[in-house]
Amino acid sequence: DKVSIVLLLVLICGCSSMNQKMNDGIERIPIDVHNVSRDASLFIDKIELVPLETNDSSLLHKYRKVMYDKETDVYAVYTREQVIFTFSGNGAFISNSKKMQGQGPDEYHMAIDVKFNPYLQGLDLLNPYGTIYTYSLDFKLLAKRKIKPEFPIDHLIAFNTEEYIFTYPSLWTDQEVAFANLRTQQIYNANYNGTISSGNSMDKECFYKIGDNFYFIPP
């Protein structure tokens, strides 16, 4: 399928064969930003407008990002209030995460990134200090897991049920991503070059999975 994103770095390695400071195993794809095609049909099949159902439970504003998962045919909207709304592929409202915000054992206090998790069939919510809350699409807690990063983390994607990739804010590290195994609690760091912007990158999507490959776009 054609896609409409620019891929800058390809991550094609697993966590099991990495050194503590990994410098290889990453394929870097240079992009010529000065020679961009004006023919959008080369990478876009179609553009569709999907009206989202509006009711007392689905009203939202100031969203950070909108995600679509083709496998489940579900949209997720992540707002600046760190509330997530889910909708079916035709725009029907499913649920929101307001009822799960709080300090309870099944609740999340802070979620700075959200990602579909195909392995647990839910949504991963990331706390910057290393807690991952995985909820079903109607926001029932499926899993709550922890990792202890050296610094706060701000983006995530699951390799499988146990292995994840995270990014560190540029305030804390010099352009590094972290490969983590939640079962063994091992974390391996990899350097990259090519930060696109500075400042707050929380609203920017960094990780993509297309086929069997994982892609990383520096924030």
What is each of the regions a protein language model found here?
Residues 18-52:
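Blade/loop signatures of beta-propeller domains
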Residues 30-32, 73-79, 121-127, 162-172, ...:
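Short beta-strand elements that form the blades of beta-propeller/WD-repeat-like
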Residues 48-81:
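Beta-strand-rich domains and repeat architectures in extracellular enzymes and scaffolds
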Residues 53-58, 92-122, 127:
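Blade-loop segments of beta-propeller domains
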Residues 56, 98-106, 147-153, 192-198:
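Short coil/turn segments at the loop-to-beta-strand junctions that recur within blades
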Residues 62-65, 108-115, 150-159, 199-206:
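Repeated scaffold domains used in trafficking and secretory/extracellular systems
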Residues 88-90, 136-140, 181-185:
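Short loop/turn segments that connect beta-strands within beta-propeller blades
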